[in-house]
Structure formats: C-alpha cells, structure tokens
C-alpha cells in the first residue's frame, strides 16, 4: 500500500460543483448543531452523524450496532456507518444553494479576477451581484453590447421593445451566465493579436487580462466555477463544539457562519416555493451572497459579521492568515513532545560536549526508555508496572536511568534561535537540583548568560535521529561560526582575565639578572616555594633552546597541542581566539576541543588565584583633564564670538562646537588610558579588564574616568552641551538630565529594533530557503572579481580574507615566471591565499553564487567552502538558510548595542584637509583650477588629485649595475641594483620601476583623491610630498559654488520673498539669504557673473545660502553661494539596520540621484518642464540621438555645461537607486554595489560576514526578468518570469525556429521576491495568504516541493542534508541484518540467527 505521504507535488485548482459533490457525504439541511437535552448531534444538522460519521468509535447513533465486529455496517435505523470516530476529521458535507453566489476571493481581491475576465470593474461587479443593476447577456438588436450595465427602468423598456430576444440578468446568476459564455481560447488569441499590432501597450489591464485568460486556458479551470451553486461544509472536528463547565458551549466561529448560510438558504427556498414577490426574493438572495462572503472571508467585507461581544467572527480565510493562522501556527511551528525547559546555571566542570541534566527531568524525558529497560532486566513484569515504578521513583529506577542516559545525546535550544548554533546537541550528565548545567564556552553561540536565562531540551528518539544528532549537531562539531568561519567557542570574561594574568609579564628592573631553570618541574617547584612569581621574567631550557619567558606562559604552553610554536606574549581575548583558529586549521577539531577545555580550566583557576578586584580608587582620573576641558571651553567661546561677528553661520558654529568636544574627549581618553596603564605597574584591574577584552570597552572606561562627552537626542541629533564630568566625579543636575535621553533611547531602541531585526531575518529566510547545494559543478564560465577592501589608505580586508574559501575562476599565474601556479577551480585555503597575495595580486577572479547556473540551488564550485567546517560544501547543504541566518543574526545582536554605551554620541571628527600617510609623488591634478586673490589655486569644479606612493628614490649616477628596466614590476626584497660601493639595493615593497630625467624611483600604487569644489590645492604635479603633509584644504561643513571669472554678479530668477528667504539672526543681527522651494512659478534660480562679453551661469539649488548681492563685483575664486552639508547624526546600527532593510527591499531612495544613460557631453538647456531642469547629453557618436535628462530644480547639479560624462556617472546629488544602477550599469555593477553597501553597515559595527552569504541573497533578488518582447514564446509582455524558465522557453522556441523573447533583468526586494516564488505554499505561508492562493488556484499551479518550507508544511522530510533526494534510496542495515526502519513487531516474528542475537546487545 502506498503511504499517503509518498507524493512528489501538490496541485491547487478551482473545484467544480461536481467535485464538491464527490467530496461530500451528504447534504446539511438544518442549521442545528446538537440537541441541548441529549447533547447528541441533530440529524441533517451541522454535526450530523449520518453525514460526517459516528462520534463514538464502532457505534452507531441509535445504539443498534455496538462493537468493532460490525465494522463498515450501515445501520438501517439511523443510517450511520459503524466506524472510527476519526472519520469526523476528514468527511465533508455540502449545502445546495437555492441561488448561485459568487466567491468573494475572485471578485473582491485586487486585481479582481472575475472583473478581468468580464472586463468589468469591482464596483460594476458588485452592483450586479448585490442586485442594484442589470447586466446585458444578449443585447438582441438594442444596439447595446454584452456586459453593459442598465438600471431597472431601462431593462423593462428593452424587454417591452424586444421581447424574449433581449436577455439581461441580475445577481450571481447573470454573472455565471456571462462567465460560462466566455471562450477563453478565442479571447486570448484576440488580445495577443492586438498586442502584436500595437508596438507598445500602455494599458497594463490588457496584459493582466491576457494573463488571467491564459491561466484559465492552461489550467483547465472553467470561469463559471468562480460562482458557486454548492458550498462545501468542512468536517465537524475541524470546527469543534466543546462543553465548558457550567453547561455552556464553546463553538468555532465557522459554525455560526455556516448557520447563517443555511438559515438564509432555507428561507430563500421557502420564498421561492411560495412564489414570493421578486423584491423580497432579491433581498434574500443578496443576504445569502453576504452570508457566503462572510463564511469564506469575513475580514474582506466592509462591515464584518460580529459575534458575541462585538468581535468579528473568524472566517475560513482568517484561519489561514497571519502568525496565528494555520500555516505559521500549526504547520511551520509545532509543539514538540519529549521536551522540557529549565533555568541554566554554569557548569565549569563539564567537558565541551556535556551538559548537566537534572535527574527529575531525565526521569520524565527518558520515561519510555527506562520502562523498556526495566522490563528487559525483569525488574518489572510488564510496561504498566514499570510505569508505576518510574512514577514512584524506586531505587532501581535511578540505576537504570544512568544506563539509559549514557551516550544518548540530547538537544539544547535557547530562544530566540537566531542561527543554527542556537540548537546544539550534548551528552547528558545527571546532576542533582533542578537547573540545567551548561558549559561556559558554548554560551557565546547560544548568546546565553546565567542571569536567569532558560533553555529547552529535546530528546531525539529513533536510532536514526540519534545518529544524526551525534554526527552533525554535537557541540564539538560546531565550534566555528557559519557566518565567517571564526571560532565562536572562544573564552570570555573570567577565563580571559585568568589567561591574561597568567601570560602577562611584570616589569623587571633593567639589567637585573634573570633566574634560570632547566625544566618545567623546577619552575613549578620554584613557584610553590614562592621563589618566583607567575609573571616574573625567567630564562628556561625548553625544547632544546634557552627561552626568555615567564612561568605563567610556560604553564599556558603545556595545554597547546604538541608541535605548536611556543606562544610568548600576553594573551587577550583576540589573541586567544587567533590561537584557537590556528590550532583548528593545523590540527583539526578534535584537538581544538581538548585544548578548549584546558583553556577553560586554566582561565578559571588563575582568575581565582590572582583575584583581581575593583574599587573606586582604581578608576583614575587623568590630572591633565582640567586643562583640556579649559582649552575646549576657550575654543567654544571663540567659535561663539566668530558667529556673533557674522564670520560663520549658526550651523557652522554648531558643527565646530561638536567637533571641539569630540576632539577633546579623544584627548582626555588618551591621557586617561596612559594614566591607567602606569597605575599599579600596568596591573590596574579596570585597565586590565579592558585590555584583556574580558569586560568593558574604551568607550565605557572613558565614561568612568574621562568625560561622558556628547549625548544624542532621541532623534539622533547631537546635543552640543557636552557632559564634562565622568561617573567617578559624578554628574551635575543638568548633566544628569541630559543623560536621561540616552538611557531611555537605549531601552526603547532595544525593544523596537529587535522586532525589526527578527522580521528582516524572517524575510531573508523566506527568500533564500530553497537555495540548496544541488550539484558538484554547474560548468559556468562566469565569475566575479574580488580584491582588497580599503578605506582611504588602510586595508580593512586583505585579499586572503576576502577570497578565502572560494574556487578560482581563472588560472593564477606567477607574474615573474609566467607559470600557472594554481589552475582554474582550485579551492583557496589560507596557504593558497597567502601565496596569491605574495605574488603581488590585489584582486583575482573567483567563482560565486551570483554567477552560478545551477537550475535548482547552487553548485559546490560556485559556493565554495562551508564556513562552519572549512571544507568544501556538500550536496544537500541548506546554504540559503545559513546565509539568511548569518545576515539576520548580527542584526538582532547589534540593535542591542546602544543599550550598553548609554546613548553617548559618537561623531567623526571632520577632516579639513586631504593628506596621505606616506611619502608620495603627485602624478596629476584633474579638474579646473583658478588662482584667487590670495594667489591660491582653487578647484572651481569637482576634480581629483592623483598621488603615487614613493617607495625609494635614487639618482641614477648613484647606482651601478641596474637589474631592472623602466616600467618593470618588482616584488618586496627583489634586487634592483647595486651601489658603487657594492651594496645590494632591494625593493622595500612591491611596486613598479620608474626612471626619468636621471632619477630612479620605485613607485607603489596610485591613489585617486576626489576633491570638491572650492578646495585649495597646496601641491603641484611632480611634487614629492611628505607623510601627512596637507595636499589640499577644504571647508568640511559646506559645499560651495565658485566664480570662474572676474566680473559683476547678476541674480537670475532669484527674488527675495519668492524663492529667497531673508533670515535675520536675532542674537547677532546677521542677515542670511537662503534659497527655498517655490512651487507656483517656474523659476530657475541662477547666479550669473558677467565680464565684458563673457558670462558664466551657476545653478543655485534649494537650501543654498547666497554670499553675493545682485550687482556685486567678484574675483575669480570667490564664493558665490554655500550649501551646508547635513549635520552628522550618530552612526550606529540604528542607522544601519534600516539601511540593510532598505537595500534588501530594493526601495527607491527619496531623493535618488540621476545617472548618465550614455557617454557624452553635457548641454544645460535652461528649459524648465514640470518644475524640472532639462539637460541633454550629446553622445560622442554623431549617429546617436541626444539623451534628455530632467532634474528637480531644488537639487544641486554636479556637472557644468560642456563637461564630459561617462555612462553611469552621477549628474546631480542624492543617493543611488539600485534599480537605476541595474538599468544603466548592468547586473554586475548592481551585485557589487549591494554586497558592498550591506558589508559597509556591518563592518562599521565590527561584524564579520562572509561575502558569499550576502551574494546568495542578492542572487535570489535577481532571479526574475521582465519580458519586453514576447516573440513567439508563451509569455506576455511586462510579465515577470524566472530567469531559468525564460532561458528554457527561449531554447525551445529557437529549436522550433521561432523568434525568442527579449527581457531585461529586474531587481525584486525581499518581500516581493518571496511572494513571487515558484512555490505557492512557501509564498502563502509568508504574507498575503489569500491573494497567493487565489492566484495559484486560477493558474492551476503545481508545487513541486523543492524548497524547505513547502516540505515542512506538508510534513515531509526537508530536501536538504540527509533528506536530499540523492540520499533517499540508501537503506541502513544493522550488522548486515534487519532494516533499521522496519517496525519491531516484524523483527520479532522472524527467527533471528543465534550468532546475531548474541552480539546485538541492545544497541538499538
């Protein structure tokens, strides 16, 4: 017999009336439920036993047949079949309607499917369905057309005129008739023809209509099935009625809704039988329509049907929707048996793979195993008495418990489970008490602490489940973080402190002789005798050489694996983690886990031994603080007076003040740390806690002993009154009051943002859940380029880190010898990466999930290494879910950050000048420079300074025997020449040789420094610059507009009172002229400078502050207007999480920048159309037409008349719109942009996420293409299609000799993409349940159950990991005999050969 679970796919369609009758076991005729006296179901009612089956097992309604003997007999008296009462969960009934009614899903949803088929609007449909207007079905010769609406009078007029030939109807009857008359095929053909005749169809409705028509054509559904003649009644057990104490009944809302339908239907039947007047019948029909609407979807209606207490009743649709609906509550999240939960306490004596299980819990969790064992050992005659024994907690029960629990892994879970490390398996160790004991090093993965956290415990029951738990989920298999491959098991807090103390070194007297020892035992002896301290410097003979070290470090090195290089430095948490990662890399997980337990022991032991304690005396305030605060006060006073004199604006003053305090705070922090470091010989406990990474940060100690600094308002704005005190000195009342902002913001943020991050994770999981590793190699030729990530000059991510765990997409060639070092498809390990770096590469091409061409999921080569185990991913790995967790989990963590700093603001100090940290040579200065009155060179437009690193420089006559030639690349340490004295000259860094005018230079790479308008340049081309020499100076607070010629100012379209506001500052009586938005008139604000025959015009954007009056004389280089840059807000993930959200949802930014669509020359026309300026780009190629660009008047334009732009350049200010990047620059540019921007946010928070996780999500966002020309394919224009389906269909059409479809890639945000998945189950359980199901039913969609979610919903094993199709057919046998899957009874029936019976000692 096939099990009902053995199916590959599920199809959803509209049900025909015949189909509904087939399902039904009888008609429900009465609205009654149960008899109030006998409490038995009423016959023909909603709970009727004749229709839905018996309520008592093997017993009919009247009691004539009572026992399993009569199985299948139908009682002649009451008509009830003798069977299981379970059938009441599956047998359906039906209600025969006296008049057809329309299904609310199909006429009320947007877009209305019925409306599209009939070409009517929802309101027109409603007026017909609710009996307000007639619709013409057959117009005869009236000159009207089918589907038109007419009112009562017209109807009667036409009837009198044309008699029976004219047919019009009202109500669902008429709609049904119209639907039945639609010839879906012909209509679809007609529309396709129409589309082909026209070039561009502007009416989207036509395309939508075509889609619906073709859906009906292809799915075999009939349009008239959207109107119901029969309503199915769902089984009574699914809408139960239960008796409460006190004799009242609680019933499901569905019963009330069904009752209304039946009542109205029966009343309508009677009215029709009595031939009642039309108006009464119509009213009843309308009420029936409303009753059925309410039954199917009560929340869709304007006035929902209310039950007791004015609560809207829950209809069938509401049962499916939302977090409490069927999908999310019962199908995707079920409660699990064999589980318990309790508070956790720390278990420092446990091994890494163990957890302490309270005996009380173990007794309950392992009950069935204990009972079986008791019976097996003949300690109990049968299961029943064994159960009694367990409940009585007899002595032998506890002896058995030890045996049962041994080597039976259990799973621990801490909510919220943000990533897969939130559930791990351990071996239980029985403990007294009621609390679960947890190993301290796994806390980080669970994000657990011992302040009252609770954890849940689950017991895997079957041998297969235990095996899987053992092999995959045991904690030693999970010591790396899947997000980045770093250890997640590193020590924290006390352990770190203990290790740091143990490995640190006391400052010794200079020149004092060191004590010497010959081996470790001697050192131990000396410590025990008190001759040396753990941290004294000693010299010792170790592994064949003499070491200068400390006894503590010797002790620490004993726990490292044999052969590991001696660690001779103080170990902070970062250092310890580095060692763990290194040991994992070199020795594998087994050795690492052993070492972890030793580290834990050492850490706790020495933290106890050194007893670091904190007292208020340890918080040392730096004596230099008073002076620094005094200086700051003076500077603030100076800024104030400048403002009062009118030299600077209020906004500039504010920014200056904030900068002064930020800088002062940094200086105080520095001097405070120096103070702390000197205190107690470098062992000040507060300092050590921060230095070792055990607790606290620079930020927190700064607030304790420095100054609290600037605080942020809830809006993120910075309050310019700095808090000058610290917590050691205590805050003044005002300071305390300002502080309250931050404290409250922290708490509010935590609450709100956690929900946001959780929702982000949910959307990420939803979009990427069906990305599973499906094959070894998809064979694609595509790849992406990955390189070093820099911020200014600093390398933030090295090449090795960036490409680690990928496969190379091209051969890696040694640039010197031209030999292939690593062929294509080499896995990049740490060594390979290091070697590639040493070859001088700064970027290479690698395989990526973005370019993978697998039909389902991605392939191993494109994905690369599984970051949690550092080996290539395996087929069946659910990499999509891992990616979603890796991105979502830090989001949730980071939102909690504000909480700890207490709202102290962090603003960056604004740079005023451009400089580089090395010696350089100025290669080029791009841009237009003018000399101003002070004879400084000023950039009058945006430009750039190109500077190249100068590594070495010699005069050629100082060198003899040159080994290199001009332009040649050299590596670090490569011999380039010898000096006349015969010394070898080698290159200090990789670079290129440059010989010119008798000077030999080795130059590094070029750096291009972009500069803004108004920047003053201090260098010339070919200047040699010193490290940190200011190359150029600029105004950090304003963008400026600069005159390029001497002349007279003329205001154009600038009028005070219209688009210029005259602000007078009351405090200083300075006057500011500010440009504001002007809607009514078409003004194009500009400032012109006129000099003789020439004139230059400058567009003035909104918010600009005008610095010159009409008629003023100006010199070249003078400032015409300033645009204040936006005040810095604090940058924390609060800014970050919405940013990530915005990127993944692919939202268009508010003021998106305009990108140049082509290369060419700018022409600013001066035209204004609809409050937008018009620009033209003239392409280089004269055959191409000029491209028109429109820009809102208020925005600042980045280009000037006659400038050249490249395709994709920004023309005005604003944020980049990802959709524009896709359109203008293409898919690759967009992928790079999205990955970079998301990484930027996380990097700012110090969170490491491997690029590949973000790439997996971006791949899913770019799955669809938009059809622009359907060719001979079955697609419709403007339809969104999966890229793979698009390619398949095109292949098919080309093979048949047709013309393929054309498309453009589109970017879908998370929510849109999730709702557009191929699987309707997955989409329905995500959001907009009814809409998804409506759509799927009409299209007759088939869900092939490819993703994880669909399979969880229908109760299959997920097609990932051990459930992958590839592994389905593998069967496991126990000692080559008997199948593990087979039920036990079968096994007992077979004669087991003696030899096997002997060695199978209960290993099941």
From Swiss-Prot:
The keyword Calcium does not apply. DNA-dependent RNA polymerase catalyzes the transcription of DNA into RNA using the four ribonucleoside triphosphates as substrates. It comes from Leptospira borgpetersenii serovar Hardjo-bovis (strain L550). Zn(2+) 2 binds at residues 778, 852, 859, 862. Residues 1381-1404 are annotated as: Disordered. It comes from the Bacteria. GO terms for biological process: DNA-templated transcription. Zn(2+) 1 binds at residues 60, 62, 75, 78. Belongs to the RNA polymerase beta' chain family. Its EC number is 2.7.7.6. Its cofactor is Mg(2+); Zn(2+). Keywords: DNA-directed RNA polymerase, Magnesium, Metal-binding, Nucleotidyltransferase, Transcription, Transferase, Zinc. GO terms for cellular component: DNA-directed RNA polymerase complex. This is DNA-directed RNA polymerase subunit beta'. One of its GO terms (molecular function) is DNA binding. It catalyses: RNA(n) + a ribonucleoside 5'-triphosphate = RNA(n+1) + diphosphate. Binds 1 Mg(2+) ion per subunit. InterPro entries: DNA-dir_RpoC_beta_prime, DNA-dir_RpoC_beta_prime_bact, RNA_pol_asu, RNA_pol_N, RNA_pol_Rpb1_1, RNA_pol_Rpb1_3, RNA_pol_Rpb1_3_sf, RNA_pol_Rpb1_4.
């Amino acid at each position: 017999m096939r099990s009902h679970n053995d199916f590959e796919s599920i199809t959803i369609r509209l049900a025909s009336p015949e189909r509904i009758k087939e399902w039904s076991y009888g008609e429900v005729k009465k609205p009654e439920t149960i008899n109030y006296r006998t409490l038995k179901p009423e016959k023909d009612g909603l709970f009727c036993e004749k229709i839905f089956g018996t309520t008592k097992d093997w017993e009919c309604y009247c009691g004539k047949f009572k026992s399993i003997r009569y199985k299948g007999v139908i009682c002649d008296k009451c008509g009830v079949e003798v069977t299981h009462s379970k059938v009441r969960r599956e047998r359906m009934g039906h209600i025969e309607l006296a008049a057809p009614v329309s299904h609310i899903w199909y006429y009320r949803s947007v877009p209305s499917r019925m409306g599209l088929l009939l070409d009517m609007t929802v309101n027109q449909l409603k007026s017909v369905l609710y009996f307000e207007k007639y619709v013409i079905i057959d117009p005869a010769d009236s000159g009207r057309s089918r589907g038109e609406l007419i009112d009562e009078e017209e109807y009667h007029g036409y009837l009198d005129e044309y008699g029976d030939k004219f047919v019009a109807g009202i109500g669902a009857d008429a709609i049904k008739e119209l639907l039945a008359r639609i010839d879906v095929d012909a209509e679809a053909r007609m529309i396709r023809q129409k589309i082909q005749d026209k070039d561009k169809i502007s009416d989207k409705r036509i395309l939508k209509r075509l889609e619906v028509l073709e859906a009906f054509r292809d799915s075999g559904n009939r349009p008239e099935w959207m109107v119901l003649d029969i309503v199915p009644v769902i089984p009574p057990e699914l809408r139960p009625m239960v008796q409460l104490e006190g004799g009242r009944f609680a019933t499901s809302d569905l019963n009330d809704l069904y009752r209304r339908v039946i009542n109205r239907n029966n009343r309508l039947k009677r009215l029709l039988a009595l031939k009642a007047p039309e108006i009464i019948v119509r009213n009843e029909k309308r009420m029936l329509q409303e009753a059925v609407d309410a039954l199917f979807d009560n929340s869709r209606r304007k006035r929902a049907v209310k039950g007791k207490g004015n609560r809207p009743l829950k209809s069938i649709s509401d049962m499916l929707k939302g977090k409490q609906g069927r999908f999310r509550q019962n199908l995707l999240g079920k409660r699990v048996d064999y589980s318990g939960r309790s508070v956790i306490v720390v278990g420092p004596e446990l091994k890494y793979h163990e957890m302490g299980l309270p005996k009380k819990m173990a007794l309950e969790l392992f009950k069935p195993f204990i009972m079986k064992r008791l019976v097996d050992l003949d300690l109990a005659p049968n299961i029943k008495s064994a159960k009694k024994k367990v409940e009585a907690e007899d002595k032998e029960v506890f002896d058995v418990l030890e045996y049962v629990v041994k080597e039976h892994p259990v799973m621990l879970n801490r909510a919220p489970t943000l990533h897969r490390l939130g559930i791990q398996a351990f071996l239980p160790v029985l403990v007294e008490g009621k609390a679960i004991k947890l190993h301290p090093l796994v806390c980080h993965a669970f994000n657990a602490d011992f302040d009252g956290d609770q954890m849940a415990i689950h017991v895997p029951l079957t041998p297969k489940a235990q095996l899987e738990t053992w092999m995959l989920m045991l904690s030693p298999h999970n010591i790396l973080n899947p997000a980045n491959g770093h250890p997640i098991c590193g020590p924290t807090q006390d352990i770190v402190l203990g290790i740091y103390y143990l490995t640190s070194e006391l400052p010794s007297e200079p020149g004092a002789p060191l004590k010497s020892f010959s081996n470790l035992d001697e050192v131990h002896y000396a410590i025990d005798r008190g001759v040396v301290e753990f941290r004294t410097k000693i010299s010792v003979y170790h592994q064949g050489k003499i070491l200068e070290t400390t006894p503590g470090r010797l002790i620490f090195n004993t726990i490292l694996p044999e052969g590991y290089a001696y660690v001779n430095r103080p170990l902070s948490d970062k250092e310890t983690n580095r060692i763990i990662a290194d040991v994992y890399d070199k020795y594998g997980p087994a050795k690492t886990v052993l070492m972890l337990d030793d580290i834990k022991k050492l850490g706790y032991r020495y933290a106890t031994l050194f007893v670091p304690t904190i007292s208020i005396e340890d918080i040392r305030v730096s004596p230099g603080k008073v002076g620094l605060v005094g200086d700051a006060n003076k500077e603030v006073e100076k800024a104030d007076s400048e403002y009062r004199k009118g030299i600077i604006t209020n906004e500039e003053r504010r920014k200056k003040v904030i900068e002064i305090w930020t800088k002062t705070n940094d200086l105080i922090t520095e001097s405070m740390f120096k103070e702390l470091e000197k205190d107690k010989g470098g062992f000040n406990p507060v300092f050590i806690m921060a230095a070792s990474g055990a607790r606290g940060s620079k930020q927190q100690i700064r607030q304790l002993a420095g100054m609290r600094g600037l605080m942020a308002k809830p809006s993120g704005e910075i309050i310019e009154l700095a808090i000058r005190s610290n917590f050691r000195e205590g805050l003044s009342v005002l300071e305390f009051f300002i502080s309250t902002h931050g404290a409250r913001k922290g708490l509010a943020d935590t609450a709100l943002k956690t929900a946001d991050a959780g929702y982000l994770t949910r959307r990420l999981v939803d979009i990427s859940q069906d990305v599973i590793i499906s094959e070894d190699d998809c064979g694609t030729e595509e790849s992406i380029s990955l390189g070093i990530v820099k911020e200014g000059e600093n390398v933030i991510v090295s090449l090795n880190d960036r490409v680690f765990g990928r496969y190379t997409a091209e051969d890696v060639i040694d640039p010197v010898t031209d030999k292939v070092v690593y062929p294509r498809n080499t896995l990049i390990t740490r060594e390979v990466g290091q070697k590639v770096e040493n070859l001088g590469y700064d970027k290479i091409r690698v395989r990526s999930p973005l370019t993978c061409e697998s039909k389902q999921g991605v392939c191993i080569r494109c994905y690369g290494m599984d970051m949690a185990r550092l080996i290539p991913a395996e087929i069946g790995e659910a990499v999509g879910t891992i990616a979603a967790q890796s991105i979502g989990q830090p989001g949730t963590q980071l939102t909690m950050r504000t909480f700890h700093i207490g709202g102290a603001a962090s603003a960056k100090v604004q740079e005023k000048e451009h400089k580089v940290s090395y010696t350089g040579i100025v290669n080029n200065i791009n841009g237009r420079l003018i000399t101003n009155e002070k004879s400084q060179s000023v950039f009058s437009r945006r430009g750039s300074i190109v500077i190249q690193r100068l590594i070495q420089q010699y005069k050629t006559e100082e060198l003899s025997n040159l080994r290199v030639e001009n332009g040649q690349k050299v590596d670090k340490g490569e011999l380039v020449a010898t000096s006349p004295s015969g010394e070898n000259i080698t290159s200090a860094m990789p670079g290129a040789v440059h010989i010119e005018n008798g000077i030999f230079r080795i130059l590094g790479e070029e750096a291009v420094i972009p500069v803004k308008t108004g920047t003053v340049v201090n260098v010339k081309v070919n200047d040699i610059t010193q490290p940190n020499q200011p190359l150029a100076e600029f105004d950090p607070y304003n963008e400026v507009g600069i005159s390029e010629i001497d002349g007279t100012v003329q205001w154009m379209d600038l009028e005070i009172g219209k688009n210029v506001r005259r602000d007078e500052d009351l405090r200083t009586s300075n006057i500011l002229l500010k440009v504001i938005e002007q809607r009514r008139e078409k003004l194009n604000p500009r400032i012109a400078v006129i000099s003789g025959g020439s004139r230059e015009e400058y567009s003035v954007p909104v918010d600009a502050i005008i610095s010159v009056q009409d008629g003023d004389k100006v010199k070249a280089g003078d400032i015409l207007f300033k645009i204040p840059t936006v005040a810095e807000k604090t940058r924390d993930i609060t800014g970050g999480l919405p940013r990530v959200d915005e990127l993944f949802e692919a939202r268009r930014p508010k003021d998106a920048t305009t990108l140049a669509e082509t290369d060419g020359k700018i022409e600013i026309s001066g035209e204004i159309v609809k409050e937008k300026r018009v620009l033209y780009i003239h392409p280089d190629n004269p055959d191409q037409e000029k491209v028109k660009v429109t820009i809102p008047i208020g925005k600042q334009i980045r280009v000037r008349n006659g400038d050249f732009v490249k395709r994709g350049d920004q023309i005005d200010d604003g944020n980049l719109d990802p959709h524009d990047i896709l359109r203008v620059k293409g898919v690759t540019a967009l992928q790079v942009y999205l990955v970079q921007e998301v990484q930027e946010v996380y990097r700012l928070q110090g969170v490491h996420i491997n690029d590949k996780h973000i790439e997996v999500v971006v791949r899913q966002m770019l799955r669809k293409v938009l059809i622009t020309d359907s060719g001979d394919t079955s697609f419709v224009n403007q339809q969104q299609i999966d890229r793979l389906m698009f390619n398949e269909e095109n292949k098919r059409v080309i093979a048949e000799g047709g013309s393929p479809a054309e498309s453009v890639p589109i970017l879908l945000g998370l929510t849109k993409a999730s709702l557009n998945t191929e699987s309707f189950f997955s989409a329905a359980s995500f959001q907009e349940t009814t809409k998804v199901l409506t759509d799927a039913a009409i299209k007759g969609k088939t869900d092939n159950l490819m993703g994880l979610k669909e399979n969880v919903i229908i109760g299959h094993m997920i097609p990932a990991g051990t459930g992958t199709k590839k592994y389905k057919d593998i069967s496991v046998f126990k000692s080559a005999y008997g199948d593990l899957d087979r039920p036990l009874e079968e096994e007992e029936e077979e004669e087991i050969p003696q030899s096997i019976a002997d060695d199978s000692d209960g290993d099941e």
